[in-house]
Amino acid sequence: FDQRRLPVPKVLAVSDDELCYLQQDLGSVSLFDALKGGREAGGRYNVKEKELLIRTIRQLPNVQIRGARGLDFTQCYPQPEFNTDSVLFDLNYFKYCFLKTTDIDFNELKLEANFRMFANDLTEEKMESFLYRDFQARNIMLDAKGNPWFIDFQGGRKGPYYYDLASFLWQASAKYSHKLRRELVYEYYYSLKNYTEVPSVRHFAQRLSLFVLFRTLQVLGAYGFRGYFEHKKHFIDSIPPAIQNLRELLHDNKFPYPYMVEVLEKITQLPQFAMIEQAAANRSDGYKVTDKNIYPAHPQDGPATFSKYDGKGPLVVTVYSFSYRKGIPD
């Protein structure tokens, strides 16, 4: 990665026995820290925070595509490649660590058949790209200029680039709005064009939805294990937002796995996973957060204008202009 000048920390020195090494200090500010205001405000990100997200998502194809060139994937641990076996492992992790804890009755054989169809679809397109595996805001450091640097990619392997995009944008705790996700997918797609051939927008969106579904089930399996079996409250609290992602995903897409979808819909209907609407906290930086509609206007009036600090308006702009009828005088 260093040879390709990717935004990753440089290894400065390695001990003779290769058990210790020194690497570049990237500071203490992560993207997760920088996005705290928008995250705690219920997903209402300001312009600066959105710019950080755009910078990050534009750099992701650089790591995925250029980072894969000349990389010996046989050295990747614990898996050299994203394959059917690893997908089935994660799907069964979801089944045993989450689904079975809900006491929903389901047919094991029918669900397994759909799992195999799903796994085959996820792995049918072979790609020469680096799958970061744990691409999240906590693993992105920011320098003084706000440029992203990537860490904790040691679990990476060869695999489809859709996976990392799904992991990043559909992380439940981030609370990204549908509009913001769409904008960031757009930024990623057009950045990807700079590094490799890309499929049509329609095909890209269809493939991405499969990986969003897979990543959601994978996350629920992890939350189930950490929360229900290891009794860690943070992971239990993270389950309802993840279920909401699943609920929206099933509503917006038609997946060709009828029995699996049937079981997943039963999960989303369970009362313990109902989303409880919480009022967003006011931001410490003065960015206005309100549950009210601050855009009241007649459609013919054009877009509304308002102050982000008090939600009041309209903004009045007076324009003065002049011209020289016979040109600029001498």
Give each language-model segment a name:
Residues 5, 60, 64-71, 98, ...:
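A general structural signal marking secondary-structure boundaries and capping sites
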Residues 63-64, 117-165, 175-179:
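Active-site acidic catalytic loop and adjacent metal/ATP-binding pocket
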Residues 221-290, 295:
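ATP/Mg2+ or Mg2+-diphosphate-binding catalytic cores
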Residues 1-88, 93, 100:
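ATP-binding pocket architecture of kinase catalytic cores
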Residues 68-80, 85, 90-130, 196, ...:
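An alpha-helical support segment within catalytic cores of ATP-dependent transferases
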Residues 1-20, 25-29, 39-44, 129, ...:
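Conserved NTP-binding catalytic cores of kinases and kinase-like/nucleotidyltransferase enzymes
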Residues 291-330:
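C-terminal accessory "lid"/substrate-recognition subdomains
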Residues 92-101, 161-197, 210-230, 242-250:
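Active-site activation/catalytic loop segments of kinase-like enzymes and analogous catalytic loops
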